[in-house]
Amino acid sequence: MRFLMKTATLAGLALVVLAGCKKPAGSGSSETKPAFTQIDWNTAGTISGTIHCAGKMPEPEQIDMAQDPVCSLSPANYSEQYVGKNGGLQNVFIYVKDGLGNKVYPVPSSPVVVDQKGCRYTPHVVGAMVGQKISFTNSDPTMHNVHMIPTVGGNQTADISQAPNGQPESRIFSKPELMMPVRCNNHPWMQAFVNVVENPFFAVSASDGHFEIKGLPPGTYTVVADHEVLGQQTATITVGAKQIATQDFTFAAK
């Protein structure tokens, strides 16, 4: 009888130990993922505006592409630093810098695509979210090179050769960075700028300077407009539910 009681006691202790070692329901070794904020289109507002260029915009400079016979056939052989029409300024990156609090938005699954066509990067300025894939394609029948030169720690330099009409090459950046330069080592006139931010609320101004940032929850925001040569401007703007708030920026031509 004493032996049976001792055996039962040991068995009970074993069950207690096993129960104590059991993982809580839902626990795992990986870190808890943040709860993403979804855009509420029933209340979302919009920031709309125009980027103006005060004064006479410098004339685009013609580029000598004679070093590559393929490139010399391109009609788009003018510089892209100052581009626009009717006083509007193109290729300005506009984004919401502050005002979203602790909201975290999902990274788009589709990549941002930059093509090398006519020996130019198209588009000249792009935006992406931190962690979003940026894909470079080569539609030209000539060799190109994608040389990305970040200045923020944690973002890795990329130096990629792409064969004529070759396969896309992609990179992902883990830190926010504005106006990250992209160059082609084979064609020194080729340049583009990549902007990486932490939310999906950004835009690039069109040829007439117009831009729109949609899907914003009602609130007050700090908005930044950044140009590759003319620098940054900042504004504070309040967006109401289902409202379009207007915010223009004016850069002085250099």
Stretches with model-predicted labels:
Residues 1-9:
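Bacterial N-terminal signal peptides that target proteins for export
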Residues 3, 19-20:
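Short, low-complexity interaction segments enriched in Ser/Thr/Pro/Gly
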Residues 9-17:
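Bacterial N-terminal signal peptides
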Residues 21-254:
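Extracytoplasmic copper-binding redox domains, predominantly the cupredoxin/blue-copper superfamily
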